C-alpha cells in the first residue's frame, strides 16, 4: 500500500478534480498541502455539482478525513462561506471529518487589498493573480509576521500580533497613498470569525502520523500545477507556493518517505489562464476549437483559458522537477475529430535547439516550439473504459506522449464522468 500525491504537470486546470475524486473514494485521508482558495475544481457526484476552492475533495465523501495542512493559507471568511455552500447541498462539515493545521497562515482583508492594488497598478509585470490575497499572505509568512490559525485561540495576544503585521502593511500603504489601518477592526473581525474555524484546529502532523501507523491510505491533493511553482515554474508568472510533490511533505508535516507514488495530472493538450509564456499557444481557430470543446473557463475566476497543442518538453521537465512517477492523461476526448494533431517535441531559441524551458523570462519569451505531426482520429474516445474501445490513432498518440515525457500513463480519462477512466497502474498499490 502506497500513499499518493497528486500534482498538476502543466499550468493547472489539468482535470485534477475528477482524478482526485476517483482516488479519494479509495483513500482514508485527503490532504491539501499548499495554496489557498485560488485553486478551483469541480466535482460531480450522484448528479450533484460541487465547486470547491479551498476544501479537500474528500470532504464530499462520507467516512473520509479531510485535512488542510500547514502549507495552506486560509481565508477564514472564504472557508466559512465554502462550508455553508456545500452544507446547503447536504454535506456536513464537522471536526470529525475536517482538520485544519494549527500552524497554517491566515489570509486577511489587508492581503486581498494589497493583491488587488498590485494587479491594478499600471507599472510593473502583471502576473494575473486571482486577487484573493494568496501571495501577500505567503509574504507575511516568510517575513515571520503572519497571523496563524492558532493565534485565534488567544485573543489576549491577537492585538499585539496584528499591530506588528500592520507596522509592515501601513508602511506599504503610506507609500501607495492609501489610508492606514487600525488594528482594532481587524482584531474584532478575527474574534467574530474565530468560532467558525477553531473547532477544526488540530496538530495535523500528529493526526497524519496516527493515520500512517494505522495503515490508512493518505491522498495528498496538490493545487495549481508544477509550471506555476514559485521555484520551478515560469517565474514571475507563478503562484506563491511550491506546487511540486516535495511540498506535500513540508506542507502537511510528514516526512518525504510517507509519499509512495506521485501522480501527475496531464491534459492531452495545453492550457493556461492568466499571463506568462506559453510556447504552444494557438490563437487561431484550432485554439478556439480546443477551448470550446474542452469548456476551458476557470472555476474560480471564470476567465477564458489560453489553449495550445501538447508541450512534451514542458511536461517532461515537470515530471523531473516534480518527482512524478506516472501521469493521468485527461481530456483525450477533446482531440476527437482533428485531422491531424501536433505535439511539441523540442524548442528553438535564437536558432538553437533546446530540450527544456529556460529559467529566464526573456529566454522563455523567445521560445519557438518544434512540432511533430500525428494522424488524428474520427471515432469518439469519449466514455471509453478500456484500450480496446480506443481508436488505433488515439492509442498511438498516448504511447508517443509516454515516450516523449519519459513516464508511463497510469490512468487515462476520456470524459468528465468519474467512471470513464482507463486504469493501467493503481497508484495506491506498491
From Swiss-Prot:
InterPro entries: Adenylosuccin_syn_GTP-bd, Adenylosuccin_syn_Lys_AS, Adenylosuccinate_synth_dom1, Adenylosuccinate_synth_dom2, Adenylosuccinate_synth_dom3, Adenylosuccinate_synthetase, P-loop_NTPase. Disulfide bonds: none annotated. Its main location: cytoplasm. Mg(2+) binds at residues 13, 40. Keywords: Cytoplasm, GTP-binding, Ligase, Magnesium, Metal-binding, Nucleotide-binding, Purine biosynthesis. Belongs to the adenylosuccinate synthetase family. Homodimer. This is Adenylosuccinate synthetase.
Amino acid at each position: 500500500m502506497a500513499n499518493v500525491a497528486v500534482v498538476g504537470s502543466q499550468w493547472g486546470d489539468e482535470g485534477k478534480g475528477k482524478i482526485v475524486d476517483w482516488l479519494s473514494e479509495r483513500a482514508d485521508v485527503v490532504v491539501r498541502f499548499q495554496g489557498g482558495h485560488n485553486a478551483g475544481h469541480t466535482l460531480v457526484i450522484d448528479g450533484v455539482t460541487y465547486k470547491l476552492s479551498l476544501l479537500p475533495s474528500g470532504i464530499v465523501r462520507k467516512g473520509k478525513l479531510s485535512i488542510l495542512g500547514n502549507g495552506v493559507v486560509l481565508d477564514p471568511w472564504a472557508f466559512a462561506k465554502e462550508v455553508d455552500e456545500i452544507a446547503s447541498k447536504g454535506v456536513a462539515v464537522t471536526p470529525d471529518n475536517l482538520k485544519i493545521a494549527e500552524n497554517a497562515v491566515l489570509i486577511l482583508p489587508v492581503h486581498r487589498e494589497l493583491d488587488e492594488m498590485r494587479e491594478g497598478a499600471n507599472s510593473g509585470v502583471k502576473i494575473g493573480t486571482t486577487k484573493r490575497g494568496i501571495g501577500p499572505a505567503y509574504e507575511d509568512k516568510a517575513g515571520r509576521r503572519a497571523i496563524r490559525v492558532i493565534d485565534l485561540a488567544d485573543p489576549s495576544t491577537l492585538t499585539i500580533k496584528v499591530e506588528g503585521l500592520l507596522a509592515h502593511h501601513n508602511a506599504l500603504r503610506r507609500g501607495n497613498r492609501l489610508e492606514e489601518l487600525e488594528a482594532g477592526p481587524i482584531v474584532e473581525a478575527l474574534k467574530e470569525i474565530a468560532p467558525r474555524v477553531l473547532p477544526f484546529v488540530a496538530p495535523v502532523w500528529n493526526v497524519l502520523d496516527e493515520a500512517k501507523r494505522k495503515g490508512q491510505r493518505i491522498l495528498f491533493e496538490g493545487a495549481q500545477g508544477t509550471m506555476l511553482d514559485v521555484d520551478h515554474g515560469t517565474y514571475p508568472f507563478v503562484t506563491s507556493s511550491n506546487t511540486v510533490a516535495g511540498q506535500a511533505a513540508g506542507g502537511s508535516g510528514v516526512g518525504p518517505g510517507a509519499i509512495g507514488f506521485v501522480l501527475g495530472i496531464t491534459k492531452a493538450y495545453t492550457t493556461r489562464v492568466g499571463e506568462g509564456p506559453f510556447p504552444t499557444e494557438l490563437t487561431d481557430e484550432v485554439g478556439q476549437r480546443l477551448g470550446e470543446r474542452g469548456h476551458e473557463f476557470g472555476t474560480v475566476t471564470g476567465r477564458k483559458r489560453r489553449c495550445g497543442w501538447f508541450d512534451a518538453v514542458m511536461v517532461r521537465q515537470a515530471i523531473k522537477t516534480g518527482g512524478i512517477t506516472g501521469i493521468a492523461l485527461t481530456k483525450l476526448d477533446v482531440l476527437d475529430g482533428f485531422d491531424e494533431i501536433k505535439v511539441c517535441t523540442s524548442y528553438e531559441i535564437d536558432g538553437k535547439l533546446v530540450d527544456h524551458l529556460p529559467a529566464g523570462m526573456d529566454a522563455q519569451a523567445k521560445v519557438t516550439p518544434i512540432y511533430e505531426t500525428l494522424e488524428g482520429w474520427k471515432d469518439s474516445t469519449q466514455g471509453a473504459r478500456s484500450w480496446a474501445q480506443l481508436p488505433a490513432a488515439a492509442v498511438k498518440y498516448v504511447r508517443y506522449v509516454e515516450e516523449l515525457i519519459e513516464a508511463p500513463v497510469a490512468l487515462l480519462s476520456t470524459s468528465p464522468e468519474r467512471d470513464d477512466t482507463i486504469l493501467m497502474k493503481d497508484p495506491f498499490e506498491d
